Design a protein with these regions (language model features):
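Conserved short "hinge" loops at termini or chain/domain junctions
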Residues: 1-53, 104-131
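Mature extracytoplasmic domains of secretory-pathway proteins
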Residues: 47, 51-55, 60-69
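Short loop/turn elements at secondary-structure junctions
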Residues: 61-131
């Protein structure tokens, strides 16, 4: 279910522990994403098939606001390791440690952009005609 607790759990899985001071911002982000999706699909609720996308979008909105207004709070996020290669079949995972020219802030920005944009094409499959 897409709610504030699901977004909290997603943030924990990313290495950020939401505190009591984050409650208002989390509520705002969840409602913003819920409203955005409902307006795009012309529906009353976020469909079950879009919940994982909504959770990531809300987490991305929250991390973006933290990065903008309280960047010191994001010290718990580990941005040193990024998966460089994943091979299906004989499992082969290679980490891109020290590779690339991106700073940790640029990697955070790229990750936030991914969270905000991932799955937007899937939203279209849930659209209804507006009369």
């Amino acid at each position: 279910m897409f709610d504030i607790e699901a977004v909290r759990n997603r943030l924990r899985s990313l290495g950020y522990e939401p505190g009591e001071n984050d409650e208002a911002a989390l509520n705002f982000c969840v409602e913003k994403v819920r409203s955005t999706i409902r307006n795009k699909i012309n529906g009353k609720n976020v469909p079950e098939g879009l919940e994982h996308i909504a959770i990531d979008m809300a987490a991305g909105e929250f991390l973006l606001s933290k990065k903008t207004f309280a960047p010191a709070d994001l010290k718990g996020l580990d941005l040193d390791y990024a998966v460089k290669q994943i091979q299906t079949g004989d499992t082969n995972t290679v980490f891109a440690t020290g590779e690339g020219s991106q700073t940790p802030e640029q990697r955070l920005t790229s990750f936030i952009n991914y969270l905000l944009s991932y799955g937007k094409a899937e939203i279209n499959s849930f659209r209804r005609i507006r009369w």
